[in-house]
Amino acid sequence: MRIDPIVFRAKFPKRCSLEQCKSRCCRGGVWADVEEREIILRNADLFIPYLRPEAKDPSSWFGETAEDRDCPSGMAVETNVSGDYCVFFHPDHGCSLQKAAADLGRHEWEFKPRFCIMFPLVVSEGVLTVDEDMDEVWCMQRENRTDPILSAVEKEVSHLFPEEVSRRLLTEVYRRETPPAILSGYRPKKAAMP
């Protein structure tokens, strides 16, 4: 995986603020790895109580699949949209997958697609970069971007990447050095199989 140097210079708010943004990053759904879809469907009963009434049917949760080298399995699937938002979004608590996991005493991201956890970082065509396409979202507006992006999402980076990769990313941002162009041997973590 190559790293876009912008990752080391980009800014982000100190933390997400759902009160400010109203979860606008959940608009339009997201691409998930097909293995993540299978985990979500296997655990559907855990999430149904947290979903909006119009999104409770598991057969309506996912749409098209496509080849995607940025997914650990090589295949991506889109989450469907209900009322402009991802089917897993709920206006009272944000991501239903995350809320259910936390309420059940599990890791908050156990079921959440990695591309959701990763935002505002994204892997695109093998390059870790910043998703600048969502500039209308509160956290991506210039006046709200106050802290180094990697320090703002340090917990997410540590969760998503192997220890040596996350340590290297975080060390580089704190040193403010030029990043390595390529992290040899990087493979994204595969979704855990509950």
Residue ranges of model-derived segments:
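Short loop/turn segments that flank or connect secondary-structure elements
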Residues: 1-194
